[in-house]
Curated annotation (Swiss-Prot):
InterPro entries: Aldolase_I_AS, Aldolase_TIM, FBA_I. Keywords: Acetylation, Cytoplasm, Glutathionylation, Glycolysis, Lyase, Phosphoprotein, S-nitrosylation, Schiff base. Induction: Down-regulated by cadmium. Induced by sucrose. Induced by abiotic stresses. Its main location: cytoplasm. The modification N-acetylserine is found at residue 2. Its EC number is 4.1.2.13. The modification Phosphoserine is found at residue 350. The gene is FBA5. It holds the Pfam family Glycolytic. The modification S-nitrosocysteine is found at residue 173. This is Fructose-bisphosphate aldolase 5, cytosolic. The modification S-glutathionyl cysteine is found at residues 68, 173.
Length: 358
């Protein structure tokens, strides 16, 4: 089997490799309007376009954060927004060495014939949308598939359906110049132990890479965004070193070394937990052929959001909080995080939401 080599092949490989630079990671700022509304409600801020723009501007203009970031995932609205000075966000990011990306899926819907499992929408007109996003400056994309652990879940139907959806998305992106971030998220919901999560994660990833190969996806021009292997949300917590061992083992068994980087989702962990777990993985003394870094949304933004609280006078304080988290995660990609990236209790607060929708 030979991988697809289109006119963008060299660019895709270069972009994916850059995003996976050790010491850098991705800020996921692609929350849908509905999801950002929930975040705003928690700080009593109205969910209107000007407030969403203000938050994104706060994040994208934070002094000192650019060396810690290689990419930012944007929601479609944000791709076309500007700073208050009139500079497009995309331009601002690119000038500072941060690659703009775009969320392209349209959310999940129930998968008929299953026990509440889901499939992801958005393949219709995806090629045309990718062309538009490329013209607007985006160079990578994200698509989230969601799987759950239960007595009989994930079902084979759900695993295959979601793997094929991710593969079709990935090849369409590559044909149109965007590096696909492949995100098969195994939710933490449930009372299962870490061994169960490891087994399911391995099964899911094996199916995903089989589908990517079947669709001739150029693996060197992709990134993987998986869940960390953890016990279920209703089970006792385990140490970061245990999570690191199970997660890296699952990845070593399933993810080809052609993939340049693995950018973890935080999956409702607290900011501090997510950083400590990433750090433990990078400290693990085993062969890891890919960069292990972050693509965090809630785990980069939560304490920043609280510090800001929608008030202009709090912007500098909120940006300092954001810088602290960015630096902590940058250190974690190198296995050099020493803990306590924020003395703020918000950093240790669980961000778990059952059946999380983006």
């Amino acid at each position: 089997m030979s991988a697809f080599v289109g006119k963008y092949a060299d660019e895709l490989i270069k972009t994916a490799k850059y995003i996976a630079t050790p010491g850098k990671g991705i800020l996921a700022a692609d929350e849908s309007t509905g999801t950002i509304g929930k975040r705003f409600a928690s700080i009593n801020v109205e969910n209107i376009e000007s407030n969403r723009q203000a938050l994104r501007e706060l994040l994208f203009t934070s002094p000192g954060t650019f060396p810690c970031l290689s990419g930012v995932i944007l929601f479609e609205e944000t791709l076309y927004q500007k700073t208050t000075d009139g500079k497009p966000f995309v331009e601002l990011l690119m000038e500072n060495g941060v690659i703009p990306g775009i969320k392209v899926d349209k959310g999940v819907v129930d998968l008929a014939g299953t026990n509440g499992e889901t499939t992801t929408q958005g393949l219709d007109s995806l090629g045309a949308r990718c062309q538009e996003y490329y013209k607007a400056g985006a160079r990578f994309a994200k698509w989230r598939a969601v799987l759950k652990i239960g007595a009989t879940e994930p079902s084979e139907l759900s695993i295959q359906e979601n793997a094929k959806g991710l593969a079709r998305y990935a090849i369409i992106c590559q044909e149109n110049g965007l590096v696909p971030i492949v995100e098969p998220e195994v939710l933490t919901d449930g009372s299962h132990d870490i061994k169960k999560c490891a087994a399911v994660t391995e099964t899911v990833l094996a199916a995903v890479y089989k589908a990517l190969n079947d669709h001739h996806v150029l693996l060197e021009g992709t990134l993987l965004k998986p869940n960390m292997v953890t016990p279920g949300s209703d089970s006792p917590k385990v140490a970061p070193e245990v999570i690191a061992e199970y997660t890296v083992t699952a990845l070593r068994r399933t993810v080809p070394p052609a993939v340049p980087g693995i950018v973890f989702l935080s999956g409702g962990q607290s900011e501090e937990e997510a950083t400590l777990n990433l750090n433990a993985m990078n400290k693990l003394d085993v062969l890891k052929p890919w960069t292990l870094t972050f693509s965090f949304g809630r785990a980069l933004q939560q304490s920043t959001l609280k510090a800001w609280a929608g008030k202009t006078e709090n912007v500098a304080k909120a940006q300092a909080t954001f810088l602290t988290r960015c630096k902590g995660n940058s250190d974690a990609t190198l296995g050099k995080y020493t803990g306590g990236a924020s003395g703020d209790s918000a950093a240790s607060e669980s961000l778990y939401e059952e059946g999380y929708k983006y």
